[in-house]
């Protein structure tokens, strides 16, 4: 996401803006990416090199502690807050949603898969109000979704990974994904890899292998 934003600024499609990275994991992975810069593809290297040469083009800041994170919600004027927290059910992003959802001048952009029943999914489904920390919050901010940015492998990628096993596992458990997609993926494993013991666990069930 950060690379996309920097690239938009580079192409003059976004004005000079402030970007706040408010996620310990996102901060760590960003610094890790910088460390292994040479492993990036050519386009990413070019974008990153441009940013190093034009550090003032983007006001980029990494947030360290929780109090500093909460202070972001008092910002006046335009800013982008990147806060990673899966389904929006926990972590720093919840405080940002509590503060920013009620205001129509704000926008929330969700880039990852949101499971049914999660706060993120309710926002994607364009509900009018949500409950956060026991408080009813009106959703007046505009909600946007961008596909294709998930860090998870797709069906083809997962099947390729499974094909790398030298010996087929005794049992495969499909534990991530909604019911329909899990059933389809389990069927693919059985048919394409000829692995018969593929289980989709149900809530509170236990298995002994």
List PLM regions with ranges.
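Acidic/His-rich, metal-assisted hydrolase cores and their charged scaffolds
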Residues: 1-209
């Amino acid at each position: 996401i950060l690379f996309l934003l920097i690239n938009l600024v580079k192409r003059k499609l976004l004005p000079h803006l402030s970007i706040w990275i408010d996620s310990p994991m996102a901060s760590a992975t960003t610094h890790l990416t910088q460390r292994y810069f040479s492993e990036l593809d050519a386009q990413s290297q070019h974008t990153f090199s441009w940013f190093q040469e034009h550090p003032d083009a983007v006001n980029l800041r990494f947030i360290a502690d929780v109090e500093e994170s909460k202070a972001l919600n008092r910002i006046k004027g335009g800013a982008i807050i990147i806060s990673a927290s899966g389904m929006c059910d926990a972590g720093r992003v919840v405080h940002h949603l509590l503060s920013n959802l009620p205001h129509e001048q704000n926008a929330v952009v969700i880039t990852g898969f949101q499971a049914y029943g999660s706060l993120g999914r309710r926002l994607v489904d364009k509900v009018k109000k949500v409950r956060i920390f026991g408080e009813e919050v009106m959703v007046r901010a505009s909600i946007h979704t961008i596909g294709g940015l998930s860090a998870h492998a797709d069906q083809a990628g997962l099947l390729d990974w499974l094909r790398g096993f030298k010996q087929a596992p005794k049992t495969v458990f499909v534990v991530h994904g909604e019911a329909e997609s899990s059933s389809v993926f389990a069927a693919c494993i059985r048919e394409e890899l000829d692995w018969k013991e593929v289980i989709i666990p149900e809530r509170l069930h236990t298995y002994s292998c």
